């Protein structure tokens, strides 16, 4: 009698979307996350070996890793970082950050980066976005990642491995937020020059209301826009994975009510 084998990670197939990994956090089990981390490590190593352009970290395959404010994101990011380090990659640890900041910092190194985030999804959802040699994955790339994943035997990390994953520390790029702000300032200057205008954000400070929706931008938005010359009124500007005001999704009209009332 033939027995049908179903891989332990078959339930996780639904996480692999068109352009990222995303779904209910209960599917991000320890054995799945650890196996996925090892697959990502292999992908990043291969990306370095086959890169067509030289990297700033010469002869040092590098990956930039960050995470959002969701409760499980830091833990998942640590799994990713540990597997990458064990594979010989240099991990540039951004900690709590935003996806654009991760992408910017990846560009400063080898073009390889990973962000544990579910963007504007509900709090019980988590996910992963990534860059390989400066490019986001295609739908085929995402599915190939899953095919590589099911080639791994599901191994539940033991206590020793989990302790190592949680306790290992990594290099954080020096002054990376200041570097990010400087790049945005240069972009604003270029835009103003292109418009041939005498009025820049430095000459005409304006008031701006920013609703961080308790996401990762809470740690960065005020500093960024203040540097650009704005007087900031901050709403919900503390990272909180419970998202007490509701889903961090600005496309939901009810999530803009507080912002609209403050602007008035």
Report each predicted region and the residues it spans.
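An N-terminal, well-structured beta->alpha segment
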Residues: 1-80, 86-87, 169-208
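Gly/Ser/Thr-enriched, mixed-charge loops and adjacent short helices
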Residues: 5, 126-263
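Glycine-rich, flexible loop/turn motifs
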Residues: 11-17, 21, 124-127, 141, ...
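Gly/Ser/Thr-rich beta-alpha loop segments that engage phosphate groups in nucleotides
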Residues: 22-25, 68, 97, 129, ...
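Generic structural signal for short, solvent-exposed loop/turn connectors between secondary structure elements
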Residues: 23-29, 104-112, 154
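N-terminal small/polar loop signature for handling phosphorylated ligands or for N-terminal nucleophile
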Residues: 50-55, 62-125, 224-264
């Amino acid at each position: 009698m033939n027995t049908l084998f179903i891989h332990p990670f078959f339930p996780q197939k639904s996480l692999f979307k068109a352009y990222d990994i995303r779904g209910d956090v209960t599917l991000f089990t320890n054995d799945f996350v650890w196996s996925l981390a090892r697959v990502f490590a292999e992908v990043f190593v291969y990306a370095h070996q086959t890169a067509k352009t030289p990297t700033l970290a010469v002869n040092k395959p590098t990956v930039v890793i960050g995470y959002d404010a969701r409760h499980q994101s830091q833990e998942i990011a640590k799994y990713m970082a540990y597997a990458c380090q064990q594979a010989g990659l240099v991990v540039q640890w951004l900690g709590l950050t935003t996806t654009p900041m991760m992408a910017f910092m990846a560009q400063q190194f080898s073009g390889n980066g990973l962000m544990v985030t579910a963007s504007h999804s509900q709090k019980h959802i988590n996910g992963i976005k990534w860059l390989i040699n400066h490019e986001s994955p295609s739908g085929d790339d995402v599915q190939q990642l899953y095919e590589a994943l099911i080639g791994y035997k599901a191994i539940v990390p033991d206590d020793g491995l989990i302790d190592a994953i949680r306790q290992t520390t990594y290099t954080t790029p020096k002054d990376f937020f200041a570097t990010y702000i400087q790049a945005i300032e240069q972009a604003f200057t270029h835009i103003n020059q292109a418009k041939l205008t005498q009025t820049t954000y430095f000459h005409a400070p304006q008031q701006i209301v920013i609703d961080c929706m308790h996401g990762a931008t809470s740690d960065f938005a005020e500093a960024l826009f203040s540097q650009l010359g704005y007087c900031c009124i901050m709403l919900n500007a503390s990272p909180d994975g419970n998202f007490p005001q509701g889903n961090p999704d600005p496309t939901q009209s009810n999530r803009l009510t507080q912002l609209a009332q403050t602007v008035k």
